[in-house]
Amino acid sequence: MNNHCFGCDFGSYHLKIYHKDADSYLMQHNMEAVQDKKTMLAYGDEAYAMFEKAPANIQVSSPMSYGNLASISYMQAFLKSLLEKNTKGQLRGSEFFVALPTDMQERSFTMLIQDSNMKPKAVYLIDKPVAAGLGLDINVKEAQGVMVIDIGAETTEISVLSLGGTVIS
């Protein structure tokens, strides 16, 4: 049985994935190129290279907009293709830790992975500010408050962390 573990950050501009077992970090532009509104032609950096240069029948866009999922089906296809390419197709039974923006609905991000063809073992949702604090090697479980500022492509989030959670964001 496969025991891959992935940490995912779905940003408006970049998709960032950490693969724990391989200790590798993958970052791609969060873009997809769709031909005739039905066929995914390219994704990630390859689709970004087509941005504003594609003919009318090829739409190049981001599946995320201001931290919200604009297209769950294209995001699922993008994520699955990207992970299969970089893990040699061994996704069944993987665990996913998803950095969740505080103003987002949990259901859409859970569905993004659970309803895909990847058949994950588990999907864990983590507040994005807590994930950022852990990524910065900050002890977020202390009683002392820590301010974390996440400056993204379309949104900026200021949060105070204490005792393993988000106090205010």
Predicted regions and their residues:
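Nucleotide/phosphate-binding catalytic cleft detector across ATP-hydrolyzing
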Residues: M1-S12, K16-L41, E46-V148, L161-S169
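Gly/Ser-rich catalytic serine loop of serine hydrolases
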Residues: G152-E154
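A structural feature that tracks compact, well-ordered secondary-structure segments
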Residues: E157-S159
